[in-house]
Amino acid sequence: MNSIKDRNGLDLTEAEDIKKRWQEYTEELYKKHLHDPDSHDDVITNLEPDILECEVRWALESITTNKASGGDGIPVELFQILKDNAVKVLHSVCQQMWKTQQWPQDWKRSVFIPIPKKSNVKECSNYHTIALISHASKVMLKILQARLQQYMNHELPDV
């Protein structure tokens, strides 16, 4: 990427300036979806049962292979090669997260990849952005999604 426009329409050509512009753009783009993760005003103290090893195993097996890694660079295939050892380690981490309600900082980071969708590639808004997240983070996200889906199916069966 040779250049991109800043928010005022001026061309940015330095790699560091372009990187900062993309960071600024993605933060603005997703800001409306953010909330304060450290705000525990409405925390429900009656948590669901502990994370189970079988949930971790299922989540790990359901992650698609041959996909790009997130910021940690760990491919899902490594977890699948390590099998039970990976399940035990990820179970321990997921269980700790569940009990403390704290997401590891490294798991909060995503690598954003801009993909041009229009001919004017100097405007950030003319790109789709995809976010690469760590496969370890995907394990916990899949567990949470499955639990929420089960809850929704029970509470709203006809929707």
Where are these regions (language model features)?
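Short acidic, glycine/proline-rich loop/turn micro-motifs
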Residues: S125-N126, V159
